[in-house]
Amino acid sequence: MSGQKVWTSLAHLSDWIFVVARCEEGSIGRNGLIFLLMPLSQPGVEIHPIKQIGGGAEFNSVFFDGARAKADDVVGQPGDGWKIAMALLGFERGISTLGQQMSFQQELDLIVEIARENGSSRSPAIRQRVAYAWTGLRAMRYLAMRVLSDDQSPETRREALTYKYQWSNWHRDLGRLAMDVLKMDANVVSDDPRCERLQQMFLFARADTIYGGTNEIQLNIIAEQGLGMPREPRGKL
């Protein structure tokens, strides 16, 4: 296989990678794709970290030049690549963030702690935004628990389509709240590890509405699959 995969999380720390590749000559779009598991420690594979705004490099570009995968490492059948990738992406966008919600709660608790210390909590606007963040996090958890309970009602299935849009925008807004609570400390390097954590959270949260499907893609999914609206015109790949 030859080609490139971009924005691969933690590829520089991984032994294996999954790849969606074209397996049928002349096929276009979502047709003719295969879902492969490939070892990274082989000739023909190069990994290049992508520097992020916060200074880290969690994402990577992976280049393949004649790399190989075993036939036993095909997931599903040749031609099913798109279907398998969408099922995996649906999990990433949805209930896989249940564990992430614990980190969200820690970040919110940290914001409240600092707001009480530096007086930001005296602002009615800050208190309102904290309350909004708290209720939003609870709503996320309850929806995720409903999905986990195997509730197959049409209402729950439609609401599940909103989950990625909901949590990613919520977390981005939490980063903005954190910076407003920190006030001037948001703009400088601090010895307080709490400030550094919130600064890093603010920077990384900017990507939440992009990876796993942008806001625009999520709104299309909600409109077309959840509300039954006409599909947006699409070009051919």
Where are these regions (language model features)?
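Glycine-rich beta->alpha junctions and the first turn(s) of the following alpha-helix
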Residues: 45-141, 208
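Buried hydrophobic positions in well-ordered alpha/beta secondary-structure cores of metabolic enzymes
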Residues: 1-3, 19, 36, 64, ...
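Short, well-ordered loop/turn and helix-capping segments at boundaries between secondary-structure elements
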Residues: 22-25, 39, 43, 65, ...
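C-terminal helix-coil-helix/basic helical segment that borders enzyme active sites and/or dimer interfaces
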Residues: 116, 120-127, 138-191
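Glycine-rich phosphate/pyrophosphate-binding beta-alpha loops
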Residues: 6-12, 53-54, 207-214
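A short core secondary-structure module
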Residues: 2-48
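Hydrophobic packing residues in well-ordered alpha-helices of helical domains and bundles
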Residues: 104, 130, 160-163, 198
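Glycine-rich phosphate/cofactor-binding loops in nucleotide/flavin-utilizing enzymes
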Residues: 84-93, 97, 182-237
